[in-house]
Amino acid sequence: KGATTETMKNYIMASTSQYGLFVNGISIDGNSDGSASSDALDGVNWGYAVNNTDPGVGMSSYSLKNNDAVTIYGLWGGGTWPNNVETNYSYFENDTVSTTVSGKATVTLKGLGYDKNFVASIVKPISKATVVAAKYENEASTATKDTAVATAQTDDNGVATLSFDKAGTYVLSAYRLDSDGKHSNISRPYGIVKVLAAVTTPTAAPTVTPTAAPTVTPTAAPT
């Protein structure tokens, strides 16, 4: 978005609480906010990551640095405490990839796992997640299973390969439902795929060797 300190308030809605600033919602168009759970599911809360890592402090305590990429995401808490379901902030290792109509787009989905102190510091592959790609129309475009034009499942290494039959720009995301079939146990990652038209090699015109004209030896006139 290229947001500045002055305009950030148009995109992040926050209020004060006894624990400091509390995020109420985020906005893409700068006009309306949204909850952490689009389906109003229980236990879905806001979190944030900086450069795809856990900053280790609350948002109001983090000091931004040049070129920091801040991601605010909604993530299911995994049920009542103690939490026996690990939920992961997830992201694409390369959030922008390119391919051609005749080629393949390969992405790697990673996530943050928790150490013994419940700090999200362990990078791990996210397997058995469904990667979805939808047509990119504008910066508000999202990819869901309903808008997807291409899907693929990640393997044990978090790798998924997609193919496209039309050139254009596509937005990527992924989801993975928990055993209850309702809650996604990863946050929704974001990426872009640029699909170029297939390059065709022109067929060379056949070369034709001209046929030499026959030579005629004149017959001498009789004397």
Language-model regions, residue ranges each:
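Ubiquitin-like/PB1-type beta-grasp interaction modules and other compact soluble beta-rich domains
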Residues: K1-P206, P210, P218
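Short, intrinsically disordered, charge-balanced linker/junction segments flanking boundaries
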Residues: T217-T223
